[in-house]
């Protein structure tokens, strides 16, 4: 699959995850769907790791080939890789909290859980928007509006 098409699909999957996490946050504290929480706990870490690995191997490598002489592009990709690492660490924390919600653990503070969920999905959405904007900008910079 072409790198940008793959990235569009990955972004679609991540945004769907964000929508699910937002629904969980909106259900707190009274209407928690424990099954949804347990499923999200199982999915979030592996999904984020797989999508980030694919993005770095397919898309970032593709960009690096086309912009090999551009230090600003390399700096941008390093920033995005760092954000991937941060998102994966945050996903681990969410996994623990979602597991506890899924198991009906009454010691989970609903307000804290809501802040954690909202912080994560807001950050992921912002990251996706930034990536899309940067890619559009990079592609326009090439003569003829396409990468070489």
Language-model segments: residues:
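Small-residue-biased structural context
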Residues: 1-148
């Amino acid at each position: 699959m072409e790198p940008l098409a793959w990235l569009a699909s990955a972004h679609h999957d991540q945004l769907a995850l964000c929508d699910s996490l937002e629904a969980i946050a909106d259900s707190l504290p009274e209407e928690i769907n424990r099954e949804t929480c347990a499923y999200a706990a199982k999915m979030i870490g592996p999904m984020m790791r797989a999508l980030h690995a694919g993005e770095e191997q397919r898309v970032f490598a593709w960009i690096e080939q086309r912009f090999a002489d551009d230090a600003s592009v390399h700096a941008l990709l390093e920033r995005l890789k760092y954000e991937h690492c941060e998102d994966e660490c945050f996903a681990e924390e969410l996994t623990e909290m979602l597991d506890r919600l899924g198991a009906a653990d009454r010691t989970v503070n609903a307000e804290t859980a809501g802040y954690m969920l909202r912080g994560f999905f807001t950050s992921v959405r912002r990251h996706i928007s930034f990536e899309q904007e940067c890619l559009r900008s990079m592609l326009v910079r090439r003569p003829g509006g396409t990468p070489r």
